[in-house]
């Protein structure tokens, strides 16, 4: 009997599973995994030593009847949880608390009181996985052998006393949309819990996350009011935090945070381990421009990690902790009437024992806005509405009311323009919104989050340096009246300009406090941490690999090829290494054009780089077109158990590549197109198709 290759086996599996699915009406289909979001969870989430991990005890001790759990990676789910808590308290009189899922244990969830309610606000991350702070909860609640204190089995419906509400944050450009909330909802229902209202789903891929959330929550509140006999009342702003100006302190006092991320950094003695809660202040060893076009920038940076105990593996991600641009800091302070007291020291405290202060304190208005608050993000309709009571005049108030009530008008005037909160208010009136409490701004805006970049170097080749490859965002969106500028990439461009001799760097007219708080980042340093990824080379270097990475999607593949070239130089057997790379023009944005020649010499005919230049001819050519042209090569390598990698844009490129690959497999095997698509799905689940994509 002829030996079956990997895809032959997959074909048989697909046909078998298809038959099983037909006869069992799909009951044997396992839901695979789906990526959403790529960033870190809130930095103050971990429960402090000595505090209870019993959520029921915590609710009883603090007099709460509503807990809003969140699983968040970028801060959005946490923000929605906070908004639900505030609304539940102010509109319906609920005694609410927000809870990080990793702060509690769940073995006694079967004792959750019938007169209380639990919310689950859950983002999907990675390959359909829970966010970092939700892993233990997810594994527990969806486990086949889930065990509660009562000892009741799943068949005995141990969670029959639990009433819950669920909302998920997902992205429809990925294969398994909102997998996290769907899995948890199914598990809770199976265990006997009673969901109130529908399980809401927000779609970041369609750009409708905020409107999905707003559309879901009104009928949810109606259902919850009926279930718990709640009476709606006129919502009046009740601060979660107190913000007190402290005249006894000055910015020069060493107890005042001026942008330091942690107490260790404030004291001048930061220590590892470095993580999403504690960044390493890393030196930028080298920085250079990769594009030759004058109107666009793409940066190559080498970030030093020697002596830090930070480690990485080829294919991992590095997080860059950015700083807001000076012009946006000034705009924000002016709009809210606090520009003249920007250096006043403030103390921030939670007014509720369960409230976590998201900003290190004491600090100053300037430091809070520059280093800690996400002031440049597009503003939400709900947050704009919350400013109605604080409008400077009746005309402004009427405009804010209209923006809050009319989503189409809000889309035209605010969303289409990609305005942040200060820009939106400037568009309404030139008068300052001086009456807005700073506490409301802390509550309504996310913590300034790190941004993640695929590492473009090999840890085998340079273990003490991490390379990144980043396009600087500066674009005029359709319908926008201003240029939208990337928060982190322009900050990095300023650092690059400074390192390369510019005494006054101002990328795209922006300036930054690039020496950091108290000049602690002087000498060109940047706060970073490493996030490990499953996007990895085969452990056996003789295995073939196929990589598709247009634009900066080539970043991790530079690391892959760098590593294989080093292995080949050391005498190791290296398998076929195929890269499909695309850009606009070979003379403008062909990333690492000369470097590929060096690797070609080391790898010889093992390395094949297939290019697609989209703007060199009248007909645009993309990587998916080149993939089709080289269908025989791709098919042959897949038969040799090649791993297929995609990095870059999820909404268009990755989806097209996925489709083309399915067509190639189906055609080479004489199968219907839908069977080819199913085989790509099986490649995903087996790890032979890997993605590192973003939307």
Swiss-Prot record:
The enzyme's E.C. designation: 1.6.2.4
Ranges where the FAD-binding FR-type domain occurs: 277-538
Record bears the keyword Amino-acid biosynthesis: no
Keyword Lipid metabolism: yes
Residues that hold FAD according to the record: 451-454, 469-471, 486-489, 694
Top-level EC class as recorded in UniProt: oxidoreductase
Gene Ontology, cellular component aspect: cytosol; endoplasmic reticulum membrane; mitochondrial outer membrane; plasma membrane
Chemical reaction(s) catalysed: 2 oxidized [cytochrome P450] + NADPH = 2 reduced [cytochrome P450] + NADP(+) + H(+)
Entry's Gene Ontology molecular function annotations: flavin adenine dinucleotide binding; FMN binding; NADP binding; NADPH-hemoprotein reductase activity
Cofactor note: Binds 1 FAD per monomer. Binds 1 FMN per monomer.
One GO BP: ergosterol biosynthetic process
Cytoplasmic topology ranges: 32-695
Cofactors, names only: FAD; FMN
Positions of NADP(+) binding: 296, 552, 614-615, 620-624, 656
Organism superkingdom: Eukaryota
Keywords: Cell membrane, Endoplasmic reticulum, FAD, Flavoprotein, FMN, Lipid biosynthesis, Lipid metabolism, Membrane, Mitochondrion, Mitochondrion outer membrane, NADP, Oxidoreductase, Steroid biosynthesis, Steroid metabolism, Sterol biosynthesis, Sterol metabolism, Transmembrane, Transmembrane helix
Family membership: Belongs to the NADPH--cytochrome P450 reductase family. In the N-terminal section; belongs to the flavodoxin family.
Its job: This enzyme is required for electron transfer from NADP to cytochrome P450 in microsomes. It can also provide electron transfer to heme oxygenase and cytochrome B5. Involved in ergosterol biosynthesis.
Protein name, entry field: NADPH--cytochrome P450 reductase
């Amino acid at each position: 009997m002829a030996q079956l290759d990997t895809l032959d086996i997959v074909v048989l599996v697909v046909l078998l599973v298809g038959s099983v699915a037909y006869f069992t009406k799909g009951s044997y289909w396992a839901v695979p995994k789906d990526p959403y979001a790529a960033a870190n969870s809130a930095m103050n989430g971990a429960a402090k030593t000595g505090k209870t991990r019993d959520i029921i005890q915590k609710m009883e001790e603090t007099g709460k009847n509503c807990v809003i759990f969140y699983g968040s990676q970028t801060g959005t789910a946490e923000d929605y949880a906070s908004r639900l808590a505030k609304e539940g308290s102010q509109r319906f009189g609920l005694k609410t608390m927000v809870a990080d899922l990793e702060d509690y244990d769940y073995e006694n969830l079967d004792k959750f009181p019938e007169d209380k309610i639990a919310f689950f606000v859950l983002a999907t991350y990675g390959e359909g996985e829970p966010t970092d702070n939700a892993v233990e909860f997810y594994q527990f609640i969806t486990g086949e052998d889930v065990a509660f204190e009562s000892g009741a089995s799943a068949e005995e419906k141990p969670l029959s006393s639990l009433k819950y509400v669920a909302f998920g944050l997902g992205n429809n450009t990925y294969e398994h949309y909102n997998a996290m909330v769907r899995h948890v909802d199914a598990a809770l229902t199976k265990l006997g819990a009673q969901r109130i209202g529908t399980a809401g789903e927000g779609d970041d891929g369609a750009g409708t996350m905020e409107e999905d959330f707003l559309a879901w929550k009104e009928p949810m509140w109606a259902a919850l009011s009926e279930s718990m006999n709640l009476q709606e009342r006129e919502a009046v702003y009740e601060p979660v935090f107190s913000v007190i100006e402290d005249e006894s302190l000055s910015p020069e006092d060493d107890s005042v945070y001026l942008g330091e991320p942690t107490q260790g950094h404030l004291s001048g003695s930061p220590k590892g381990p470095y993580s999403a809660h504690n960044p390493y202040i890393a030196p930028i060893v080298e920085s250079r421009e990769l594009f030759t076009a004058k109107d666009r920038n793409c940066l190559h940076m080498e970030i030093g990690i020697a002596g830090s105990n930070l480690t990485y593996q080829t294919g991992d991600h590095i997080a860059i902790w950015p700083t807001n641009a000076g012009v946006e800091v000034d705009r924000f302070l002016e709009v809210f009437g606090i520009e003249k007291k920007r250096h006043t020291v403030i103390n921030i405290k939670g007014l509720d024992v369960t409230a976590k202060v998201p900003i290190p304190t004491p600090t100053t208005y300037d430091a809070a806005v520059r280093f800690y608050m996400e002031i440049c993000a597009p503003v939400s309709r709900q947050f704009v509405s919350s400013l109605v009571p604080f409008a400077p005049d009746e005309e402004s108030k009427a405009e804010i009311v209209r923006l809050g009530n009319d989503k189409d008008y809000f889309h035209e005037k605010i969303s289409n323009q990609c305005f942040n909160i200060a820009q939106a208010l400037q568009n309404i009136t030139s008068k300052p919104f001086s009456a807005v409490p700073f506490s409301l701004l802390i509550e309504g805006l996310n913590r300034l989050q790190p941004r993640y970049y695929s590492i473009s170097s090999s840890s085998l080749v340079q273990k003490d340096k991490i390379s990144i490859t980043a396009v600087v965002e500066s674009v005029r969106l359709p319908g926008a009246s201003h240029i939208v500028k990337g928060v982190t990439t322009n900050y990095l461009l300023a650092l690059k300009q400074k390192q390369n001799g510019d005494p006054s760097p101002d990328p795209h007219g922006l300036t930054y406090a690039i020496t950091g708080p108290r000049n602690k980042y002087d000498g060109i340093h940047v706060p970073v941490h490493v996030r490990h990824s499953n996007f990895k080379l085969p452990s056996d270097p003789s295995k073939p690999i196929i990589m598709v990475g247009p634009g900066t999607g080539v970043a991790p593949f530079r690391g892959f090829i760098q590593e294989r070239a080093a292995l080949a130089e050391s005498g190791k057997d290296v398998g076929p290494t195929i890269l499909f790379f695309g850009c606009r023009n070979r003379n403008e944005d062909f990333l690492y054009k000369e470097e590929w020649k060096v690797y070609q010499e080391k790898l010889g005919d093992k390395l094949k780089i297939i290019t697609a230049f989209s703007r060199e001819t009248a007909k645009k050519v993309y990587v998916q077109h080149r993939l089709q042209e080289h269908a025989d090569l791709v098919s042959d390598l897949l038969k040799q158990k090649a791993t297929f990698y995609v990095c870059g844009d999820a909404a268009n490129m990755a989806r097209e590549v996925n489709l083309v690959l399915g067509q190639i497999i189906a055609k080479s095997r004489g199968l219907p197109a839908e069977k080819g698509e199913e085989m790509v799905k099986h490649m995903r689940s087996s790890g032979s198709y890997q993605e590192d994509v973003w939307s």
